UniProtKB/Swiss-Prot annotation:
CDD domains (UniProt xref): 7tmA_OXGR1
The protein's name in its UniProt record: 2-oxoglutarate receptor 1
Role of this protein: G protein-coupled receptor for dicarboxylates and amino dicarboxylates. Receptor for itaconate produced by activated macrophages upon bacterial infection. In the respiratory epithelium, couples the binding of itaconate to the activation of GNA11 and downstream intracellular Ca(2+) release, leading to mucocilliary clearance of airborne pathogens. Receptor for leukotriene E4 (LTE4) produced by mast cells upon allergic inflammation. Binds with high affinity to LTE4 and elicits mucin release from pulmonary epithelium in response to airborne fungi allergens.
Family annotation (PROSITE patterns): G_PROTEIN_RECEP_F1_2
Signal peptide: none
Gene name per UniProt: Oxgr1
Keyword Glycoprotein part of the UniProt annotation: yes
Entry GO MF terms: AMP binding; G protein-coupled adenosine receptor activity; G protein-coupled receptor activity; purine nucleoside binding
Sugar attachment sites: N23
Species classification: Eukaryota, Metazoa, Chordata, Craniata, Vertebrata
Family designation: Belongs to the G-protein coupled receptor 1 family.
Principal subcellular localisation of the protein: membrane
Extracellular topological domain residue ranges: 1-38, 91-116, 173-200, 264-284
Length: 337
């Protein structure tokens, strides 16, 4: 049985963390060596060039800029910043959790993951609210479509994300164990009581609330388009695609990670069997790159949101748009926020 961790561990206990847990984490270290480098490598190899191309399109090809263009550009930027940190994590897990880049980089890389996570959540929430106003309150959309409102919203997202994630630089720790430096994530760091309450507040304000907002926005949008007078097939089809994509990102990528992070922290605070804690930790490990897969969903979102983006992408890769794409551009609903 594992002793409850109701108070901060001593330095000797902390440095002997794997020994204190016995065999609870032995299999996880091996599992992480096999699983995380592969998944993170795939995410990096697809996401880095994909977001680089997306940013280039938004900056050099997309004119005029709408509110949605500003939000999508900021979303691509935060994804790209996160993707640049993945090679460090790939090396770390592939080497058996041996961190060679120092304490500052440990905190910076862990900070980068969570900053991207909550920036993405908030940018997608802003986009959903803009779509809601355009479709449900179309008379107000002429004001909200102006790019200055999107710029203000994006600036707010950057500030809120920075403030929300900043405490992690103090809570996340690195340590030395068995002659190796380990860069611990939030759930494995010390001071669990503080981490528990910080995690609950962070999850409630920057995930649960946006999840409710996004769900309500898109259920209202679909209901309005289904029963309302606006029945343009192109508009309805595009709204359905956006709804499915956004809800998949929130419920498949983000939700499991947040649920399992709460459970993982609680499992370290409670006196439970090594077997149960091992299974909880393993499930949490699986959920971490799953959360990072939102970068794939975002790449699809760029294409779904705008037919102009599709045309610009085709021009970059030197391909000719199909007749359907040309027709889609003519018939596309131009009410993007």
């Amino acid at each position: 049985m594992i002793e409850p961790l109701d108070s901060p561990a001593s330095d000797s206990d902390f440095l002997d963390y794997p020994s204190a847990l016995g065999n609870c984490t032995d299999e996880q270290i091996s599992f992480k060596m096999q699983y995380l480098p592969v998944i993170y490598s795939i995410i990096f190899l697809v996401g880095f060039p994909g977001n680089t191309v997306a940013i280039s399109i938004y900056i050099f090809k997309m004119r005029p800029w709408r509110g949605s263009t500003v939000i999508m550009l900021n979303l691509a930027l935060t994804d790209l910043l996160y993707l640049t940190s993945l090679p460090f994590l790939i090396h770390y897990y592939a080497s058996g959790e041996n961190w060679i880049f120092g304490d500052f980089m440990c905190k910076f890389i862990r900070f980068g993951f969570h900053f991207n996570l909550y920036s993405s959540i908030l940018f997608l929430t802003c986009f959903s609210l803009f779509r809601y106003v355009v479709i449900i309150h179309p008379m107000s959309c002429f004001s909200i479509q102006k790019t200055r409102w999107a710029v203000v919203a994006c600036a707010g997202v950057w500030v809120i994300s920075l403030v929300a994630v900043m405490p992690m630089t103090f809570l996340i720790t690195s340590t030395t164990r068995t002659n190796r430096s380990a860069c611990l994530d939030l759930t494995s760091s010390d001071d669990l009581t503080t981490i528990k309450w910080y995690n609950l507040i962070l999850t409630a304000t920057t995930f649960c609330l946006p999840l409710v907002i996004v769900t309500l926005c898109y259920t209202t949008i679909i209901s309005t388009l289904t029963h309302g007078p606006r029945t343009h097939s192109c508009f309805k089809q595009k709204a359905r695609r956006l709804t499915i994509l956004l809800l998949l990102v929130f419920y498949i990528c983000f939700l499991p990670f947040h649920i399992l992070r709460v459970i993982r922290i609680e499992s370290r605070l409670l006196s439970i069997s090594c077997s149960i804690e091992s299974h909880i930790h393993e499930a949490y490990i699986v959920s971490r790159p799953l959360a990072a897969l939102n970068t794939f969903g975002n790449l699809l979102l760029y294409v779904v949101v705008s037919n102009n983006f599709q045309q610009a992408f085709c021009s970059i890769v030197r391909c000719k748009a199909s007749g359907d794409l040309e027709q889609g551009k003519k018939d596309s609903c131009s009410n993007n926020p």
